[in-house]
Design a protein with these regions (language model features):
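Short, intrinsically disordered low-complexity segments
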Residues: 27-74
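C-terminal structural segments of small proteins and small subunits
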Residues: 76-77, 85
Length: 106
């Protein structure tokens, strides 16, 4: 099973988000894909963010690096499932403050 982890940031916080992203790239295996900064809300995601995509075998490592580097930002971790609403809600885990998702965009 594959997962996404989304680290959210305020539009005014782009520089710190970029630094956190670089930390993720340097501390995680190349098999963990770290996407670019997305500077707007997209789909159900309510704030700018960047996304990691990884296999289940990297779950513990990704979570540990996120906990160490997120600097108080909210992180949504969810499996990739056919039922996207369930993936983003009942099967999701938050690090930090949970944010209201725009589930009507799924």
């Amino acid at each position: 099973m594959n997962f996404h982890a989304h680290l959210f940031f305020a539009p005014s916080d782009q520089q710190t988000a970029s630094w956190i992203r670089e930390q993720m790239i340097s501390q995680l295996p190349e098999s963990v894909r770290v996407g670019p900064l997305l500077l707007r809300a997209a789909g159900p995601l309510p704030l700018p963010m960047f996304q990691l995509e990884y296999g289940e075998e990297f779950s513990q490592e990704v979570r540990q690096v996120m906990e160490n580097c997120r600097r108080g930002r909210s992180v949504l971790i969810h499996p990739l499932l056919a039922d996207e609403v369930a993936a983003h809600t009942v099967h999701a885990v938050w690090l930090g403050e949970p944010l209201p998702l725009r589930l009507d965009h799924l």
